[in-house]
């Protein structure tokens, strides 16, 4: 035990985008970390970068949460005192095409994880949920900006997996009084570690706006596809609440600290800035960060997308003593720094840098 905190935090999906940044914050705050990741949409190089940035050793297990014996072995061999759960498939568009894969991986994997926690008496559980559990908040009964009390209704298989998992956790905490769970419904992550050593590294063509724009800027993609410009917004493009990944990582650790001090049973928190940006506003901010206009084409709407997802983060601001501190422009600047430094992300078979 090297940290000032007692026990070890298991981070599932810790080699992924948000997970890796959260591991850095955990280690900087004195926690010890064990990462479990099947590397289906991440690379082990991220683990090496975590160690490089923090100067601390991370225990890494390449384990799929569907592999119950392998997961049980991790719990048996480590003194795990809390779990932060990021692992899962995460693309809205892809989930519409392969729904069974999303239901099997995301839901069954989480059930296996909770069963291991129960077996090994691990209490505190931070679940990486999503604003997609709100479905379309502009429907009747919805509210913008979105409070935690907004009716939930997933509009894509991905969003429904997050909603079902929330329901599973809520049901389990009603009968399992030793489970203490935070449901973190975050909005649209972006940005990268200010060192430029960690960032979003999607395998294949990016599904999210910021890494897509970044690959256009660095020359890996020809142009940005804007999925629809006929939404009822100021410029016709959808509105999202973008949150810097470092702000998001700090929120996960704030939630964990809160659980260690308070028994909440099961409580949701929105993680966002409270300010929405359209696709074109983000594109303009990124163009400013790069220093030139970036090409785009308008294409038909994407299945499962909704017009506006903007958070009301008041509960997290007040209870977790957390709020965002980085702007959409800073998100773009940090993303661009990462993409310039590592045009091919963690794929070290490419040595090209962008000048």
From Swiss-Prot:
Enzyme class: isomerase
Source domain of life: Eukaryota
Gene Ontology terms describing biological process: galactose metabolic process; monosaccharide metabolic process; UDP-galactose biosynthetic process
Keyword annotations from UniProtKB, A to Z: Carbohydrate metabolism, Galactose metabolism, Isomerase, NAD
A GO CC annotation given for this chain: cytosol
GO molecular function (one): UDP-glucose 4-epimerase activity
Known cofactor(s): NAD(+)
EC assignment: 5.1.3.2
Knockout mutant characteristics: Leads to sensitivity to thiabendazole and microtubule-depolymerizing drugs.
Catalytic reaction(s) noted: UDP-alpha-D-glucose = UDP-alpha-D-galactose
The keyword Lipid metabolism appears for this protein: no
UniProt KW Isomerase keyword: yes
InterPro entries named among the record's database cross-references: NAD(P)-bd_dom (IPR016040), NAD(P)-bd_dom_sf (IPR036291), UDP_G4E (IPR005886)
Pathway connected to this protein: Carbohydrate metabolism; galactose metabolism
Residues annotated to bind NAD(+): 8-39
NCBIfam families, A to Z: galE, PRK10675.1
Function recorded in the entry: Major UDP-glucose/-galactose 4-epimerase under glucose-rich conditions involved in protein galactosylation.
Family: Belongs to the NAD(P)-dependent epimerase/dehydratase family.
PANTHER family documented for this protein: UDP-GLUCOSE 4-EPIMERASE, UDP-GLUCOSE 4-EPIMERASE UGE1
Name of the protein described by the UniProt record: UDP-glucose 4-epimerase uge1
Organism: Schizosaccharomyces pombe (strain 972 / ATCC 24843)
Name of the gene: uge1
